[in-house]
Amino acid sequence: MNNGVEVRFFAAARAAAGVDHARFASAPLSSIIADATRENPLLAHVISQCSFLLDSVAVHDKNILVLDGSIIDVLPKFAGG
């Protein structure tokens, strides 16, 4: 039995979210992002600068449908080379 989509926040995204992970219903990535940031303007700002992995694969199309059992990693930009 799957329990929705797990979203894992890292670094500045974790600090802004106040949690290291959250669960959401299956939906397009853009909807999951909207749900995650709806009442958190700081997270909305941070997440706008993040990249996303869906089941360990980089995602560039936020309209992609994220299915139950999937894991999204929210990764802020990192300094360094």
Q: Residue ranges of each PLM-predicted region?
A:
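Ubiquitin-like/PB1-type beta-grasp interaction modules and other compact soluble beta-rich domains
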Residues: M1-G80
